[in-house]
Amino acid sequence: MADHDQVLERTLDAPRDLVWRAWTSPEHVKKWWAPRPYQTPECEMDLRPGGKFYTRMTGPDGFDFSGTGCFLEVVEGERVVWTSALGEGWRPNETGEDCGGFPFTAIVTLEDAGEGRTLYRAVAMHRNEADRETHAKMGFHEGWGTCADQLGEVAAGPK
């Protein structure tokens, strides 16, 4: 891990194949991508290198944010890498456009954790300390942590 990275890990109470499905299906992503009470009414995913990754989040306070990224790597059932610095087809996004004011690259990995559980790891790589700090102040650990917990709930299904 580099100095400018944010890292989040969770052990989810769902098998890896179900976590993968929940992470890669737009209909499932809409259920967990934004920390409640925020919502994700829109999600588009072309799950291949160079493919588009688009989400739109809304909140009760009038918050409305959309972001377009680009998938860099997809390893079925194991790993997804995407960046906010690029849009569909590897086209650069403008700084601040779809980047939350700073570009980052996310690496999400899934590993079997035994007993039908999954080790979920998300790394947000930033270009410098200022961008990492901005992301931290936006609530990286709280927000991404809540979303990881929600991902686990969606993957596990109704109890």
State where each predicted segment sits.
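A generic structural micro-feature
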Residues: 2-4, 47, 61-65, 98-102, ...
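Short, highly charged C-terminal tails/helix-capping segments
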Residues: 42, 154-159
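Short, surface-exposed coil-to-beta transition loops
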Residues: 5-7, 40-42, 64-69, 102-106
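Beta-strand/loop substructures that line and gate deep hydrophobic ligand-binding cavities in soluble
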Residues: 81-83, 91-142
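Hydrophobic pocket/interface hotspot
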Residues: 19, 29, 53, 71, ...
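Glycine-rich portal/gate segments that line the openings of hydrophobic small-molecule binding cavities
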Residues: 42-90
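A short, structured loop/turn motif at beta-sheet edges
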Residues: 16-17, 46-48, 72-80, 109-119
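Hydrophobic ligand-binding cavity/cleft-lining segments
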Residues: 1-40
